[in-house]
Amino acid sequence: MKPLKEQKIAVLLGGTSAEREVSLTSGDAVLTALRNQGYDAHPIDPKEYPVAQLKEQGFERAFNILHGRGGEDGVIQGVLEQIGLPYTGCGVMTSALTMDKMRTKMLWKGFGLPIADMEIVTRDTVDELNPLEVVERLGLPLMVKPSREGSSVGLTKVNAVEELKNAVDLALTHDDTVLIEEWLSGIEMTVPVLDDQVLPAVQIIPEGEFYDYDAKYISDNTRYICPAPMSEESLQELQKLVKRAYDVVGCRGWSRIDVMTDANGNFRLVEVNTTPGMTSHSLFPKSAATVGYSFEQLVVKILELSA
């Protein structure tokens, strides 16, 4: 096989999801990093370019930095498999599964891994929703979120029983399945995994009550601590848990797993990002930097792991 530097590489960026802007920023950073190191990399936006024709245009490999639906949900992965183009990140099944928070959590739960207690509501069952019963079981506050939307789109913190129905209705505008979860009041962190190696956790301290879209991409007041401070014992437990969560859903190459702690300090798995952000605010590069990866080295490593 030709060395990677001699291959024509498509950097897939942009796309049509709610996270298009973030993907364009990530893609630009990845493209620059590859070109700076002598790779023959080209920006390809599936919104404007038929990805199914990449191979006949001489492309030999794809760096997928599309975020959200269409890019992280198995769709683009299926197209690339179909035309036989190796690509970065997770395969079709894992991408499709992890885009669906509810089914990801059901799988983790089936393997005995810890998740938040939750109720599942769909468009078909929303009329049967009994807010009082839900609050009795899960307590207050509650977190309501669509099962399939990234970048914290459609999230609501519910502080009173009478707010629950509106929060569910809002989330249902983004997806037909909604999760109502117990509020996790502990520490929020995200843990990158690169080539089966668990990298240092990043603790997230948002200015507001939770890590929403603004805190993720716009605010400079969100604080990050990496490595996240914890005892050696907790660190070992976290690394083991994250590696198991990564393996259970079948991740490959690179992914980022979000974890929170409950009021008693117990870890709870939240979700998987199979195409983590690679912007100046992004957490994967922050973490990788603490173990010696420059941004450019990280990008090349991810490319080398493509399959």
Curated annotation (Swiss-Prot):
Binding site for Mg(2+) 2: E271, N273
Classification via Pfam families: Dala_Dala_lig_C (PF07478), Dala_Dala_lig_N (PF01820)
EC number of this enzyme: 6.3.2.4
HAMAP family: Dala_Dala_lig
Function description: Cell wall formation.
Species lineage: Bacteria, Pseudomonadati, Pseudomonadota, Gammaproteobacteria, Pasteurellales
Coiled-coil residues: none
Residues binding ATP, per UniProt: 135-190
Keywords, ordered alphabetically: ATP-binding, Cell shape, Cell wall biogenesis/degradation, Cytoplasm, Ligase, Magnesium, Manganese, Metal-binding, Nucleotide-binding, Peptidoglycan synthesis
Gene Ontology CC: cytosol
Top-rank EC class of the record's enzyme: ligase
Protein name: D-alanine--D-alanine ligase
InterPro entries listed in its UniProt record: ATP-grasp, ATP_grasp_subdomain_1, D-Ala_lig_Van_CS, D_ala_D_ala, Dala_Dala_lig_C, Dala_Dala_lig_N, PreATP-grasp_dom_sf
Family: Belongs to the D-alanine--D-alanine ligase family.
Gene3D superfamilies: 3.40.50.20, ATP-grasp fold, A domain, ATP-grasp fold, B domain
Domain ATP-grasp: 105-304
A single MF term (Gene Ontology): ATP binding
Swiss-Prot/TrEMBL catalytic activity: 2 D-alanine + ATP = D-alanyl-D-alanine + ADP + phosphate + H(+)
Binding-site positions, Mg(2+) 1: D258, E271
Gene Ontology biological process terms in this record: cell wall organization; peptidoglycan biosynthetic process; regulation of cell shape
Cofactor: how bound: Binds 2 magnesium or manganese ions per subunit.
The protein's required cofactors: Mg(2+); Mn(2+)
Compartmental location: Cytoplasm
Pathway annotation from the record: Cell wall biogenesis; peptidoglycan biosynthesis
